[in-house]
């Protein structure tokens, strides 16, 4: 009988890996189902990156978690540009001694957010040359979050954080359990 492809969730880290995972399913389906393989592959609508799947689930459940479903997603480059704009607005791009560049600021922010760690600990461990800028970075990160909220923007870190928050809601978790029979995660060990 097999599994209903509409009830399978396939996730991976990169678009390339998601495409490869989908191609593998297509090859297996063609080998097993022959001419009927399209039934399997066309029904496989929940395959993609963690961020893409997360964005889709967040839009589906936005009202329940207090999120505007019309959010825009910033990729790393867009996020770095917004960080730079906020950095400039705060006058941090014109300091006497060189303030960290936008990419470094975004890396620090992302590390702190994803690790749910204190900024000072992140700086000491991974960015020791930026320790002297801790207070300015806190101000920058607060303004960056405000700018994202004002623009209804989520960055890649936000997608994962909101997804984790969404999965803390028992009703939503139950809905997800009833939606999927199989969850396949590529490179799970990573």
Predicted regions and their residues:
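Coupling/switch/interface segments within P-loop NTPase motor domains and analogous charged loops
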Residues: 77-148
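Non-catalytic alpha-helical coupling and interface elements of nucleotide-dependent molecular machines
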Residues: 3, 26-33, 58-63, 84-92, ...
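P-loop NTPase Walker
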Residues: 1-69, 73-74, 80, 151, ...
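Surface-exposed helix-capping loop/turn segments at secondary-structure junctions
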Residues: 33-37, 63, 88-98, 149-156
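Generic, low-specificity signal for short hydrophobic/alpha-helical stretches with a mild N-terminal bias
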Residues: 7, 39, 65, 87, ...
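Conserved protein kinase catalytic domain
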Residues: 22, 26, 51-55, 106, ...
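Conserved helicase NTPase motor core
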Residues: 9-12, 17-18, 46, 71-79, ...
């Amino acid at each position: 009988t097999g599994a209903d492809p509409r009830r399978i969730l396939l996730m991976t880290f990169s678009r390339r890996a998601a495409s490869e995972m989908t191609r593998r399913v297509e090859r297996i389906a063609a080998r097993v189902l022959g001419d009927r393989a399209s039934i399997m592959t066309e029904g496989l609508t929940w395959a993609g990156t963690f961020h893409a799947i997360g964005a889709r689930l967040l839009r589906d459940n936005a009202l329940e978690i207090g999120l505007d479903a019309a959010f825009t997603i910033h990729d790393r480059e867009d996020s770095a540009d917004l960080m730079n704009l906020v950095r400039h607005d705060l006058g941090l791009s014109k300091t006497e001694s060189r303030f960290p560049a936008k990419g470094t600021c975004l890396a620090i922010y992302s590390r702190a957010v994803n690790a749910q760690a204190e900024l000072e600990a992140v700086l000491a461990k991974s960015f020791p040359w930026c320790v002297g800028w801790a207070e300015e970075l806190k101000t920058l990160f607060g303004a960056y979050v405000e700018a994202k909220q004002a623009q209804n923007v989520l960055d890649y870190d936000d997608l994962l954080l909101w997804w984790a928050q969404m999965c803390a809601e028992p009703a939503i978790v139950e809905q997800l359990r009833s939606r999927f029979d199989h969850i396949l995660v590529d490179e799970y060990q990573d």
